[in-house]
C-alpha cells in the first residue's frame, strides 16, 4: 500500500503542477524547468537511498519520504509563486524517492522466497494501475476544484500509510 500511495501522490501532483503553473501566470518554460528539477529530485537521491535504508531501516526511510511528500503539499498550499511550485516539486521528488524505494524494498520482506516474484509483480500492477488512474483524475480535479484542492487531497492518503508506519516504529512488529 505504501508504494501505491507514494507513487500515486507523486503522479497526482506532478501531472497537475505544470498546468497549474501556466494557469497561474507562469511561463511554459518555467513549468518545464520545475518538472526538470522534480525529475532530478526523484532520481538523484537514489545514489544513497539504499545506504540510508541499511542504516536507518526501510520503514523509517519510507516514513521520511511520506513526510516529505506531505511537506510538498504544505509548500504548494503556501502560495502560487514560482518558488512555491518549484519547492513543492523538489520535495515531491525527494519524498517519492525515499517513500517508493523504501516501500518497494518492504514488499519482499513479507513473503517467502518462492512468493517474492509474484508479490513484486502484483505490487507493480497495483502501483501502476493507481498511477494511471490518478494521472487522469489530476486534470479533472485541477479543472473543477483548482490547484489548492489537488494538494489538500494528498494528506488523507499519506496519513493512511504514515500513521501505521509510525505506530510500527513506536511499538514494533507483532
Feature locations, PLM:
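A membrane-interface helix-boundary motif in multi-pass transporters
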Residues: 140-158
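Structural signature of the two symmetry-related core transmembrane helices
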Residues: 60-75, 155
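Short amphipathic helix-loop junctions that connect adjacent transmembrane helices
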Residues: 15-34
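Helix-to-loop junctions at the C-terminal end of transmembrane segments
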Residues: 44-58, 142
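Intracellular juxtamembrane helix-capping segments at the cytosolic ends
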Residues: 98-112
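A late C-terminal transmembrane helix in Major Facilitator Superfamily
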Residues: 115-144
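Paired small-residue
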Residues: 72, 83-91
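Pair of pore-lining "gating" transmembrane helices in MFS-fold secondary transporters
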Residues: 1-10, 90
Amino acid at each position: 500500500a505504501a508504494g501505491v500511495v507514494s507513487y500515486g501522490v507523486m503522479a497526482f501532483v506532478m501531472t497537475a503542477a505544470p498546468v497549474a503553473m501556466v494557469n497561474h501566470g507562469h511561463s511554459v518554460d518555467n513549468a518545464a524547468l520545475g518538472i526538470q528539477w522534480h525529475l532530478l529530485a526523484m532520481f538523484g537521491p537514489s545514489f544513497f537511498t539504499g545506504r540510508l535504508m541499511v542504516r536507518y531501516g526501510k520503514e523509517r526511510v519510507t516514513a521520511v519520504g511520506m513526510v516529505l511528500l506531505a511537506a510538498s503539499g504544505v509548500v504548494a498550499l503556501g502560495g502560487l509563486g514560482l518558488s512555491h511550485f518549484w519547492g513543492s516539486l523538489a520535495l515531491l521528488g525527494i519524498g517519492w524517492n525515499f517513500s517508493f524505494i523504501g516501500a518497494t524494498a518492504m514488499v519482499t520482506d513479507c513473503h517467502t522466497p518462492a512468493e517474492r516474484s509474484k508479490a513484486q509483480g502484483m505490487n507493480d500492477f497495483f502501483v501502476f494501475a493507481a498511477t494511471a488512474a490518478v494521472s487522469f483524475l489530476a486534470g479533472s480535479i485541477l479543472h473543477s476544484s483548482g490547484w489548492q484542492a489537488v494538494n489538500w487531497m494528498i494528506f488523507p492518503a499519506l496519513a493512511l500509510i504514515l500513521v501505521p508506519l509510525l505506530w510500527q516504529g513506536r511499538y514494533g512488529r507483532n
